[in-house]
Structure formats: structure tokens, C-alpha cells
Amino acid sequence: YQRAHIPGAISCPGGDLVYRIDTLVPDPVTPIVINCAGRSRSIYGAQSLINAGISNCVYSLEKGTVGWWRAGHALAQGAGPRAHEAGLPATGKRRDAARRLALACGAHAIDRDILKHWRGEAENISLHLLDVRLPEEYEAGHTFGAVSAPGGQLVECSDDWIGLRGGRVVLLDDDGVRAPMAASWLRQLGYENVAFMADGEELEPDETGLPAGEVHEPGESGPEDAYYPDCATLEEDLLASEHYVLEQIKLPEQVRRDGLVSFSPHE
């Protein structure tokens, strides 16, 4: 977002959208447009709002900031308004909607006793304990053994955090909205054993900071780090990429025709 964003856009991580939308857009008839750099995260964010029963018209911006730039529109850089600075969200109805959605998708609502039991079985059955809140919330205090996995990024890059599709995945938050929303998406992605805390049950934080060995660079990147090529250069690069892809698609057929590689059964 700081490198490049559409003027007037509010920075809101995808995993926080449903949690914070009523504070950001209190009017139920105001259209909502979600964008990212390209397409996948904006689709995820927009569909999350729709799945949660938001009454507003929700749109995903096709091709995101890259498409905006290629169309000749200006992009803003640097810090801008951030969703979590807009005030404390009202979570009641969103919590109920998120819970219903997660359960409908096949996720499980568990309590502290079940989690304690699963911790005891972790040597034999993999347990991924993931805190889906913002990184700064995680650093301020989190459950022992939990790993920071912000909800939107977790859905986008789930294999960065979850090593086994059949392992147990328990998602944690402190609001009862973000964890079940992320759980609904992990179930739709095919993860088999996904759970969240029942009734938005909060776990008391007993650790602060980052896990040992995890590198955290303080500070924020600014406009000096941004690089957006001019449209002519971007077009040239894209054409070169398209040509490369087309050549790679044709390569296997050419190999079959030319017989470049062959092995006898004994080799």
C-alpha cells in the first residue's frame, strides 16, 4: 500500500475487512470497491464481504493498481489512512455471520479443553496454531506457541504456514470474526481439519514479541522504495513475458516431434 495505492484508498488487510467494515463504511448503501496490486486478494476480500452478508454492493477492481497504472491514472505513495485507526469495530452481527459461515464450510468450533488435548497430541498429530490478527496485535500479546499468520496472507499463501493438509489447524483471534472467516476460506481451499475458538472465546495472551529466530525490521517503507516503470517499459516487459510463455507452451510438442530424448525400458 505504501509503495503504491489508488488515491483515496484506505489500507485494510484482507483478513480484517469483515471485522472492520461497519466502522469503515457505516452506510449500508454505499458501494464498496476492493483492490489489491492485481486480482487475487481483491477477489478474496470482496467475496469475504459478500459471504458475510454485507448489504452494500461490493466490487473487486479488475487488475488492481497495475491495471490502474497501465490505464494512465496516477498512483499515490507513502502512508495513508489505515483501517485499524478508524475506531473500535462493532463485532456482534459480524461475529454471528462469520461463525455460521465457518461451520457451514466444515470448520470446527472448539473450546480450551479441546485445544489443550490437541496440544498434548501434537507429537503424533501435527498442530498448526495460528494467530490471524495484525502483526502488531500479535507482538503486543499472544497465546503461547501461536505463530503470527495475518488472515488475508494466510489464505493467499497458506502453504507458507501449513505444512500438512491433513494436520490440525487452529486459528486464533480476540474478536470472534477474523478466525472463523479465515477458517471458512481454508476449508474451501481443501484443508481438512480447521478449527476456531467457540463463541469467539478469547485466549489470554501469555507471550509478547516475536518467536525466537523470527526477524522483524522496524519502520515502514516509503516512497523512496517504490518502483513503477513508465508505461512504455512496462508494455515492453509484458510483451517479452508473453512471448516467453508462448514459446514454453510450444516446447513440449516440439520435443515430441523432434525426438530429442528417448530411453529404452532398461535405461
Can you describe what each PLM-predicted range is?
Residues Y1-H128, V132-E267:
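Rhodanese-like catalytic fold shared by cysteine-dependent sulfurtransferases
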